[in-house]
Amino acid sequence: MHPGNVWGGSLDAVDSDRIAAEEEERLRNTTEWDRGAIHSQRSELDETQQGWLLAPQDNWRKKKKKYVNLGCVSVSRTVFLWTVGSIAVLFLVVALPIIIVKSLPRHKSAPPPPDNYTLALHKALQFFDAQKSGKLPKKNKVSWRGDSGTKDGLPDVVGGLVGGYYDGGSNVKFHFPMAFSMTMLSWSLIEYSHKYKAIDEYDHMRDVLKWGTDYLLLTFNNSATRLDHIYTQVGGGLRDSESPDDIYCWQKPEDMSYDRPVLSSTSAADLGAEVSAALAAASIVFTDKPDYAKKLKKGAETLYPFFRSKSRRKRYSDGQPTAQAFYNSTSMFDEFMWAGAWLYYATGNKTYIQFATTPSVPQTAKAFANRPELMVPSWNNKLPGAMLLMTRYRLFLNPGFPYENMLNRYHNATGITMCAYLKQYNVFNRTSGGLMQLNLGKPRPLEYVAHASFLASLFADYLNSTGVPGWYCGPTFVENHVLKDFAQSQIDYILGDNPLKMSYVVGFGKKFPRRVHHRGATIPNDKKRRSCREGLKYRDTKNPNPNNITGAMVGGPNKFDEFHDLRNNYNASEPTLSGNAGLVAALVSLTSSGGQQIDKNTMFNSVPPLYSPTPPPPKAWKP
């Protein structure tokens, strides 16, 4: 029996065969659909695979990117390899050649050829070696010179007066121009030591200077506390002399056998001041030799009360005919200004700058008279040099009160002097060849031109060093290069840029004086001794000198640019110590070797600070 139909509906029997058939049909349809799907997927897969095989080679396989772990960051392996490769290439292209070049032996590039001023300077310094008196050092390179004057001053002068320099073509030692020459050489060394070093003349120059200052220390009792005299010259003579002396005889220094008198003076304020200036200036040069510098300073200061004393205010040449005939001094107050400035720079003692700026000193010297003859620097006129030297103080340190008023006047006077040197103001005549006639057409023009060229060139360097582009000549502003051009034009004339195309410096250029008025250069170096008058035949011959006195600057041409190369014409053909000192100073100021600047500081090494130093802070307070 069957139970009742709880769900409702018919309780009739189901056709089992029909149900089975329907189920079979459903399963068959499902199976066919699955096979189609599978077949479709397989067809698509086959097409993709074919695409892989048929695609270009660089696209047919895509690899997964790889990375390199650098610790702090991960980068693509490709980027990493590119970076490393680039660094390697950069090393090969840049670093490796540098390493190779640095590992090779170094060859310094050749320096530029020296200019004419340098070449002439080498020559000009040799003149001083040819003028040395006394027992010569072994390294003296002038083959035709030997020991001479080894008994000068003996036995009358304690220690003698051996050494120093002969002045020109004679065998006289004039202390006044010799001291001035040493002062000028020191000045050029202080301002341009780097240039002397650049051309390898620094040690030579100092040897030349020391030979002179060693001798000047013998010309007075430098160990005394109070001086009563100073020696003014050794040897001498007059042009009309008829007894054996340095003028009457024509002998080389090594053969001298006549008496050589020593002249002295108890009232030679000008000479005392000049020697003081020379020693003070040299002490600045030799600061690296403290003992010698101290000795020079002591000598310079010992002379100060001597030349300041009113009882000694006479010129050294007064009453001395053999001095008056050649180096007659005409003033002394210009030397006072000159010495005062150098003493101050050497010692820092304000007493000296106060003296140099005392109004009565420049007024007595006529420093502000604006007279052309007082604008010409020389062994006899220190005004232009002294005022430029103190203008330096104002330009670089500007000390102010109480010196400013007088320093300003010195500065203005220096500017006026420089204006007077310029052609457009027609203060001094010029030859048709361009040589300025500072000595008003008188003989020996080159010495004055050389000193003026140095001062002009130096003043331009002072202004350039302070950043001042020029100065005023009245209402007209003049640039510094105009002064340099002036100095160059005058020195170029001396070196051969003149109507005769002739160098007036022996040994420089192809054409130069061959018959220089000079005893030592005139007589053959054959070890034969000539008597007092025997040498006259060498003076009077028309043949060139057997010995070239290399570097000697002769007196020069006349106002018509004419020069006669004759020994007897001593005004034209004789060199002098002070002339060559001016030439050396001008040449070193103009040469481009070592640069164009000056040494601003060495001059002031001993000058004290202008203002009181800041006091130290108080000690820390403690209860």
UniProtKB/Swiss-Prot annotation:
Topology within the bilayer: Single-pass type II membrane protein
Enzyme Commission identifier(s): 3.2.1.4
Location in or out of the cell: Membrane
Chief site of localization: membrane
Catalysed reaction equations from the record: Endohydrolysis of (1->4)-beta-D-glucosidic linkages in cellulose, lichenin and cereal beta-D-glucans
Transmembrane segments: 80-100
Residues on Cytoplasmic side: 1-79
Keyword Transmembrane helix: yes
SUPFAM superfamilies: Six-hairpin glycosidases (SSF48208)
Tissue note: Expressed in basal region of leaf blade and proximal parts of leaf and floral organ.
Residues bearing attached sugar chains per UniProt: N116, N221, N328, N349, N412, N429, N464, N548, N571
Cystine bridges: none
Ranges facing Extracellular side: 101-623
Alphabetized InterPro entries for the sequence: 6-hairpin_glycosidase_sf (IPR008928), 6hp_glycosidase-like_sf (IPR012341), Glyco_hydro_9 (IPR001701), Glyco_hydro_9_Asp/Glu_AS (IPR033126), Glyco_hydro_9_His_AS (IPR018221)
Gene Ontology BP terms: cell wall organization; cellulose catabolic process
GO cellular component labels: membrane
Pfam families recorded: Glyco_hydro_9
Any GO MF annotation of the entry: cellulase activity
Alphabetically ordered keywords of this record: Carbohydrate metabolism, Cell wall biogenesis/degradation, Cellulose degradation, Glycoprotein, Glycosidase, Hydrolase, Membrane, Polysaccharide degradation, Signal-anchor, Transmembrane, Transmembrane helix
Active site, UniProt feature: H517, D565, E574
Family of the protein in this entry: Belongs to the glycosyl hydrolase 9 (cellulase E) family.
Protein name, per record: Endoglucanase 7
Organism: Arabidopsis thaliana (Mouse-ear cress)
